[in-house]
Amino acid sequence: MNVHKAPIIISQIFLFSALIALISLAAAPFAMADAASNLPTPPEVWKNYDPVAGDFKEEVVREETKDGVYYKDAYISAYINGEDIRVFCKYAVKAGAKKAPGLMNVHGWMSGPAIDMKYVNDGWAVMSHDYSGITKRPHHTKYPEAMGHGHMEAKKMGYSLIYDRMPDGSQLRDPTATSHYLWNAVQRRALSYLLAQKEVDPARIGAKGYSYGGTIMWNLGMDPRVKAIVAYFGIGWITYYRDHAVWRYNNPYQAPEQSPGQKLFLSAVAPQAHAPHITAASLWLNGSNDHHGGHERAGQTFEAFKS
């Protein structure tokens, strides 16, 4: 049996139950820095970002009610680092619903937004947004020229994804310049759009993300508007650790010196850096030999959670 697929078979039933349970459990330069490393942490990176600010400038491209379900596809504006990004979102909810629990359903690498109808049929209001910016699709998030690093097909389009190095090869100096920050900011803006829907109960918001959607789920778990998250096949420990095969149980253990850009990324942007600051009830699922990240470091991530 393919071990990657085994958890997926049970995921729909399990994730639904998990989100219900988890929600019930959860009633530029940076002035501040981590005392030990003198590097910024995720809360410092995000303290000046307001995901609610500015007009959505909603442009509805599809709207219908069918078989008792209301559907809406629309573009909204996200204001990030001085740029206006047009984010494509899909929304569905039972027609006439009131005070419905809200769900952010976040897609994986190179994928696109999709509504999980199992949740809609069970009474949830579901929002799914595009952050990959794949332009071959009829509708996709539109990154301006200055935000070309948001396109997952950046290389094909003449851009570069930004992690611990800038496109010119220099070391990362500003965490907000990374692709990861951009995708997280877009996600938080889409959450604001979900909360703006009349059918949604803002006190009951959950989110689940698959693969890279699970990877950026760690940041969303820090957002106080979210009560519960599920991250599956998105575990972090990619930059530096997977990139350089720095496996925890290498024998002998080998760990090349980290560059300044890697140190900054790992402190301020990496998914696992968010663990000590997550306020949402959290569930994490992953295959024991999933190549996506440093699965063997799961214990370190859990140890970092608030007790």
What would you call each of these model-derived segments?
Residues 260-274:
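Active-site nucleophile elbow and catalytic-triad environment of alpha/beta-hydrolase enzymes
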Residues 13-27:
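Bacterial N-terminal signal peptides
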Residues 51-97:
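N-terminal cap/lid segment of alpha/beta-hydrolase-fold proteins
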Residues 88, 98-108:
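Short beta-strand element of the alpha/beta-hydrolase
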Residues 278, 284-286:
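Short beta-strand/loop motif that positions the catalytic acidic residue
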Residues 188-253:
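Primarily recognizes the serine-hydrolase "nucleophile elbow" in alpha/beta-hydrolase
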